[in-house]
Structures are given as C-alpha cells and as structure tokens.
Amino acid sequence: MALLSVSCREATPARAPETPKPELFLLTALPLVWSEDFGLDQPGSPALKALEQVYRVTAIDLPSQLPDGALLLAAQPRALPAEELVELDSWVRKGGRLLLLADPMLEWKSNIPLGDTRRPPMAFADTGLLERWGLRLDAPEERGARDGAVSERSVLTASPGALVATGDGCNVRDAGLTARCRLGKGEAIIIADADFLNVGSDKRGEQNLAVLASQLASLTR
C-alpha cells in the first residue's frame, strides 16, 4: 500500500506556474477604485472588477509616477499641473501607451457638492495637451444617452463629446467619438466619453466593458 501511494503521488503532474498578469496603471477622478465615501467595505466598481480579471491594476496620482513603456488608463483625471502634463506628453513619446477618457460633459451622478475637489470634474480639464497632439474636443450640443460604436463594438454613452483633428498626428474615428494618435515611440487612444464606465451588470454594461477591454488590448499588440 505504501508503494502504491508513493507511485500515485509521483504520477501526479506538476501544476504549471500561473502566467503573471500585465500591469495597468490607473489615473482617475472617477469612483472606480473607491466609492465616494471612501468606505473600505464598499466593493470596487464593475469596471475595476473587469480590469482586474486581466491586469494588475495600480492606481497613481500623477504621470511622473509612471515607469517607461507602461500601459495607462487615464479616465477623466483631475486637472494636472503644467509640469505633469509635460511629463505625460514626454512619457507617451518615449514609448508609453495611453487610453485617455476625456469627457467634456460628464453625467456621472455624484453626491459630493460642486466645488469640492473630491468630486470628479464635470468636463475634461484640457490645458493644451490635446491641442499639442493635433486634436480639439468639442462639447455636445445636446445632452442625453447615445448609442454609438467603437471599432464596430456597440457602446452606450452619455452626452459624449466630439474629437476633431487639427493636425496630422491623430486619426479621428467612430464619428468623432475616438481618435488614435502615434506620438514618437508611443501611442494614445482618446475616447470623448467617460460615462460609459458607469455600468451595471446587464448586457449593456457588458458591452461597454468589452469596448474598454478591446481598446486597452489594442495598445498591447
């Protein structure tokens, strides 16, 4: 019996080591990682849960914290000081990969009073970054939900903006909802909406998160 037991243990195949997840850095003012009251007992958002299935997500406060060549999701970030905008531009041009959600009319509901710095910015604070990349972000003429598409994937947005090319570095797509920019050795995708991350667990939520996943994946190919 002892010999049989040893033989069975030796025949058990060794478990292959798990492949480590790639790292994704997250820069955002949206309540994706923490709820608005910063309660530790509050679960992460559906968007964060979806990201963590694929990536090791690391939240940062400033672009200067990024390592070279990394992947960054910047989702409606707070206004950055000028030196950090320069840092972000330089980081991309040195090989960084950026998915920027720049919403000119955020509809995400918040209980934080207007003027409180904890509240997500109602409009993307563009202080020249998009202009430097050859883009203009226009606010919508009318507010409300919009059915759209990103790279032929259905997406439900809320009061999305429109991107307009003002130079040669970016290719505007999806009826102005997105743009893809080659910048030096790096690349940036801009989506003129951030509300599409404010989802539940229904089919439309799954579709929106599939758009997020596909755009991030396209930056790693």
Feature-to-residue mapping (PLM):
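Short, surface-exposed patches at the edges or C-terminal ends of soluble domains, predominantly
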Residues: 2-221
